[in-house]
């Protein structure tokens, strides 16, 4: 495998070209990219956990250090001012020397407010990208050049196309997440609580709760019907029926986002439904290719959901086509088939049709779909279908012309299991689709 250093060198060359093109298009001289700052809890001296600006970590794998600055002009070596205070109260990261530092000029910044004296004197044509606009104004950046929409749209659009360095980082994140999922399944099988399963996951991935790319969803039994369940009960339920784990990992700032669902018993209807959702998810991925709209795959999976609802006699006496047409599949899979993945879990530009930011919204019938792009080589996406038994979504169907088609007795029997979601992370290539998750043998 090519070394991370050589992949990073090519990655920086790609980012430099994107920067050159964006600066030329929007008539700017350079971009000043801010890692961010710590923000204190209201009426307290304790800060929220630091989350780095994703446009900053696109350039350098520095994810834990506030008050850093990057100056890029697309021509000269990117210049990184790395925050290096004298501080005996807090941990101070040393000046980095790593695989990437040959391609970036790294300069120590001893004081957070010292950046002003180090920047070029003429700043009227510098764009600022970061979370603290008032800091940019203090530095003399023109208000119109603070987070300029055109520049950000341009950079976001091309972030959809991962470099080989980015794909290498994402494959490493997959390995970490897969280790976590295996540890979590073992913890579930041994009867642990959601809280303790989460600890097992974090231990296996080497993450803290604040390091994972999103809050882990560790859902036992009916909690699996809450799409973003993050409560973490300390007590294990008296009866273990099901376990849905939606949890990822991060490597050099790049995310993995995986979901698996397990049945406590292997001989019930729910266990068979888990197997069938898994099989249909793999079958859909096998059909994926460049040049097709992501929306099409979402619609196709609703057809697959209809097939499963019919097979398991959850919906009866209705064709699969009629189920989809009348949206009887909707309450069972209320979210989209997936989303772009990268520096952010719900990565940017899912609706962007070109580098000018042209927006194509999700279909009115499926408003929660997070991507309407035509698939192209270099894109990374999640494929995460599910079937859930959510009373608030099912309740409107208990009356009306379609109520008779719902097998309410079967639905009531499945509700204590919550739901099912199976999620893999895939890379679109010219002639194939790479399933990074299954390549690591995560069943």
From Swiss-Prot:
Any one GO cellular component localisation term in the record: cytosol
Native species: Escherichia fergusonii (strain ATCC 35469 / DSM 13698 / CCUG 18766 / IAM 14443 / JCM 21226 / LMG 7866 / NBRC 102419 / NCTC 12128 / CDC 0568-73)
Cofactor note as given: Binds 2 manganese ions per subunit.
GO terms for biological process, alphabetical: proteolysis
Protein name (Swiss-Prot/TrEMBL): Xaa-Pro dipeptidase
Domain of life: Bacteria
Functional note: Splits dipeptides with a prolyl residue in the C-terminal position.
Residues holding Mn(2+) 1: 257, 339, 384, 423
Taxonomy of the source species: Bacteria, Pseudomonadati, Pseudomonadota, Gammaproteobacteria, Enterobacterales
Keywords: Dipeptidase, Hydrolase, Manganese, Metal-binding, Metalloprotease, Protease
EC number of this enzyme: 3.4.13.9
Keyword Transcription: no
Residues binding Mn(2+) 2, per UniProt: 246, 257, 423
Known catalytic reactions: Xaa-L-Pro dipeptide + H2O = an L-alpha-amino acid + L-proline
Keyword field contains Transmembrane helix: no
Alphabetical list of InterPro entries matching this protein: Creatin/AminoP/Spt16_N, Creatinase/aminopeptidase-like, PepQ_N, Pept_M24, Peptidase_M24B_aminopep-P_CS, X-Pro_dipept-like, X_Pro_dipept
MF terms (GO), sorted A to Z: aminopeptidase activity; metal ion binding; metalloexopeptidase activity; phosphoric triester hydrolase activity; proline dipeptidase activity
